[in-house]
Amino acid sequence: MSQGPIEVMLFGDFDKAAAVSALEKSFGAMAPRAALTVSAAARDMHFPAPSSTPVRLTHRGASDQAAAVVAWPTGGGINGISEGRQLETLAAIFRDRLFEKFRAEQAASYSPDMAANWPVDFDSGGYLMAYAQVKPADVERFFAFADAVAEDLIAYPVSADELQRAVEPTKQAIERAASGNTFWLNQLKGATYDPERFVALGKLYRDYNSVTPAMLQTLAKRYFVKDKAWKLVVAPQQGLGSVTDAR
């Protein structure tokens, strides 16, 4: 608590002069603080090495429940935040397609998900990750379906209608959230010492609204690389002995 910067952000209806005066007498009156040193190792974000054979973990729960994960490395950094936002749209389309694939080809009531993570405080460490809870017998089918969705997104641009259905909920969420102070607090956190966050906020809505099918296909080609994928299976202790045991 004695090191590092203190950032105070005020939002809402208040008297600016009174607020500045209060800050000068409180936080502004504190003694200078030493910089918080961060080691190079702490800032070095590593994605796991690719695994053609899934890493295996086991659980002691129900014998008919397993989980499967496949992830691809992306990037990071506030300067590349526009790409990170485009990847969120790509992930939404991937999620919908994976869900439909299970429903159409297996009539299964699984709810697979897909996440796009783009760390703004690090220049690397981001990922696209698809995952689902399935029956142990369907683990390999999950990986096959995920590979098929990735390959299709690489080969063909998405339709304008599919893109609209993927991005519209995000745009509406931004419009709703922007009416509250918490939205601005979360978006501008750290902007005092990283002005790029002001820039990133200024293009938030535009980044989602301007994404095109061609952009998403380019991203799919860049990141859905089979040789870079990392896979994980969490299986019951009895069963699925064909994957690497990493307990």
Where are these regions (language model features)?
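M16 family metallopeptidases and their MPP-like homologs
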Residues: Q3-F11, D64-G77, I81, R103-S210, ...
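Generic structural signal for individual residues within well-ordered alpha-helical segments
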Residues: V20-S21, E140, Q164, Q217-T218
